[in-house]
Every structure is written in structure tokens, then in C-alpha cells.
């Protein structure tokens, strides 16, 4: 009997081993098949390499925002977003757009450019001007540019104005709304919710905290914003009027003049666009395709020979000289925050590390720091500025290229460079500092919630449920005043200005690049190309490569990112994308204000940030 049980046990043991073997084998087989499937999709599952027919038009069909640096999309967020049907939004890196236009200018297969910009959102004028520079270079080569559109928003029309001919749909129009700076204000709301806002600041024009303590824009903030908005709009109008050979007044009518003009064409925006000289011809899609087919040759799909911007980029070859030295490009784009941060945010430790990497690289002979930031953490700004100073002390030239925005903390990280180059429409300055602390003791008490206890120091009981004592408030204000004095002292030392001279142009006031030059805050008016040329000149370089220093992705992250692009996995849901377009600007502004209170992470809570520098 014992032998029988032993035999039965051996049989069951053998069966269990067999089941385990089959289970593991199937699991491993599924895993290997998954790897093989991913490999096949990644390397063979996408379309063949795009080809450029000769001759062809390059269609600049930009979809999505123009950015300084592309973001890394977290794969887990992407997978979660796919459940909601959200697609990956395209991002167009400014320098890629310009490089592509310049590459096409010298490509014999490309005989013209078609601007099809209906999916390009409103974009800052400084970035548009850099693209426009490349469009002018393309035209100078003798190749034509045509703009096509059913309806042009302001940014789309700005680029379209550089075309040789602008087409508009018969039921379309051109809407030029000008520039503005409007904010939401929450003082009364916070009072109704019994939220106490403690504000500490230095600077008459430091208006970042106004939404929390006022119900309207202060006169000082209105004065400052009116000045730089007028300059930006004037630059827009002058550029377009010059391109279209029309009177600038045409682009800046009063409401009465606009209504009178619209009435003269029975409310037809397309007819008004023709009458004012904003466009050249009204054409349906069929008429447009026929005309472009005559210019570039007909294709088999009742259209014209063309290749899209995204397909064309895949055909471009890098022009890289392995024997040449490098000029390193470090991008600081976004709000400045402490520590390591992903792309889209300027991490103090992240950007400082990239600058240090460039400083220690013997092949790098000069550095261009590209700044597009409204500022943020004062502590993180100083971490980056210290590394800029270390680069300068090492003997390697460092030039700052200011993009659309280099204000407050964005100016802080720039001021120690060997040379600062801004465009006329750059917004910079905003030299000031503040702190905001919200406490809820009144609201809690109304709800019947109270805080009580003991502590070992006068600061032990300070918190969101107890409020701030008079002494704590005084300590915060003294710290802010010290931070402001340090800020303007650094500006004075680095810009060779007296403290009085700095204080007169500081106080949180925003300046355009043109005004900043007059006040000694920048050295030169120019764009990114000028900054690179200046860095090369200072380093005595004739031949060089541009080396974009970025936080490296791991091999796994690189693979996942490229794989996601191929299989079109979608990204995480953005609440703004769910809202109607008319509500998205309001949601964006509320999100920005909330992040000011919740997400900023300066160790001391001191911020050099420009909230009112967003142009609408």
C-alpha cells in the first residue's frame, strides 16, 4: 500500500512538473512573440522612406505648437490616455522648422513652398519672426511661396504675409485681433471662501501676485503692459504692412471703421480681405489644386506634386563635420523649478548639469544658452547662474540667446553671460521677487475645525490651519527684501550698472528687447543665428558643429519613445482638451495660477516669476 501511494505521488508530481513546464514554456513563448512583434512593428511596420518627386513643392503643414524643445512623453501616461482616445499632439521644434526651410532652399528637387498652416495655433511673434527670416531666405533663392487657407488666425496670417501669393477660401476670412494681456482675479472669491493670502514682494510693477490680492489690474501693471503690448503689435503691423505693401492703418482699424468696412461688403469677410489687400485671390479647393498643379506639376490623385513637412524631414541628411569643434546649445525653456525636472520645465539641477557637461567637454569651445522662460524659483535660478559664471570663468565664451521670454528668473540665469542677445520683441526684465502663502484658518474655524497645541519655538505653530503671526510675516518680508537686493546687486555687478540705475529699471517692470538694450540689460539685438555667430567669433571658430546638449534618455526610453511614434500610442489626457475651444484660454490661465500656489518648489518660497508676460 505504501508503494502504491508513493507511485501515485510520483505520478501526480510528474503531472505537476509537466503542467509547470508547459505553463512556463507558453509564458516564455508569448513573451518572445511580443518582443518579436514589437521589433517587427518598430523596424518594418511603418511606411517606407518618403521620396521627393522632382519637381515638388514642400508643404509646410505645421500641426501643433512651435516649441523650443520637444517634450519626453511618459509611456505610462500615454497608455492611460489611450483609454480616453487622446492622440499624441505634434510639437514643432522651432529650429527644426527653420532648418527644414533652409535645407529645402538648396534642394534642387524642391521648387517652391506651400504654407498650409490651418492646424498651427497662435504663436509668439518672436518665434514667428525667426521662421519668417527663413522664408525670406527661401524667396531670395528665386523659389516661390504660396499660402493657402480657409481661415487665417493672426499667427498663420503673419507667416502667410511672407508668401508671393495668398489664397483664401470664398467663405473664409482673416481675423487680426491684436495683442492683449488679460488676467483672472480672485480676491473676492478667496475672501468668500475665507482663504487668507499672505503676499510678500518688492517691486512696484511685480504683478505676479495681483490675481490673489486684487479684483483688477493695478495702474502700474496696466502702464507697463500697455507699453510692451504696443511695441509688439507695432512690430507685427509693420512687418505685415511691409510684406503686403499696404497702409499700416489698414491693419489697425477702430471698431467703427471695421464695422463700416464690413458693412460695405455685406458682412463678407473674404470679400473684405480682398478689398483691404490682405489676400490675393479667393479660390475653392478644386481651383487651388488646379493652379498649384500648373505650377508644380500634376500628381495622380487630382492634386499637385508635393511632400509634407513631416515626410520631408525624414529625407534630410545631417551635415556634420567630425573634425570640427562644437558650439554647445543648452535650452532653458519653461518655468524654473528646483532640482531635476523633465523637458518643458527648467530644472535648476538639470540645466546646471548640462552647462557643466559643456564646460568639461574639451570638444566644446563655446556655449549658447537659449532662454525662453518667465522665471520661477529664485534658488534654482541662482544654481543655474552659478554654472553660467563657472563657464565664463573657465575661459569658454557663453552667449545668451533670448527667445520670446526671458523675464525675472529668466533674466537671472542670463545676466552672467559674456554677451546677451535679445530680439526686439523679446520680453525680459521683470527684475523683482515675491512670495505667496495661503492659509485657511478662518475657513476651518467656520467649519468647526480648530488647531491647538504647543511648540518649542515661535515658528512651531505657523501653518495653513493657524495662519502666520505678525513676526513670521515680518521675517518673510525681510527675506524677500534681501532677495531683491541680491538680485539687483548681481545685475549691477554683471551689467556694470550702479544699484540706483538697476533699481530704476527693475521694480518688476517688463521690457521689450529693444527697451532692454537702451537700459543696458542686454548687449545686442539679434536672433539665435546672431548668438551662434557671436559665440563662434569669441571662440575664434570658422568651422564648427552645433551640439545640442540635452538630458539623455535611457536606451529603454529612447526605444519606447520611437516605438510610440510608430504605432501612434496616445498620450495622457489634458483636461483642457476636453473643454470647448472658447473655454480653453480660461482653463489654461486658471491652471497657471493654481500651479503658482501648488507646484512651485523653491526651498525658501522665493520666486522671480513673471505671470503677466503671456501675450494673448
Put a short name on every predicted segment:
Residues 2, 80, 322-327, 331-363, ...:
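Intrinsic disorder and flexible/low-complexity segments
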Residues 267, 288-329, 384, 561:
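Extracytoplasmic and endomembrane cell-envelope/extracellular-matrix remodeling and assembly machinery
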Residues 23-42:
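Hydrophobic membrane-insertion alpha-helices, especially the h-region
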Residues 38-46, 97-99, 313-315:
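Short alpha-helical segments and helix-capping/turn motifs at coil-helix boundaries
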Residues 49-51, 56-183, 319-443:
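Cleft-lining beta-strand/loop regions that shape enzyme active-site pockets
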Residues 183, 187-291, 441-535, 539, ...:
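Charged, glycine-interspersed solvent-exposed loop segments at helix/strand-loop junctions
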Residues 1-22:
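N-terminal Lys/Arg-rich, disordered targeting/topogenic segments
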Residues 530-562:
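C-terminal intrinsically disordered, low-complexity extensions immediately downstream
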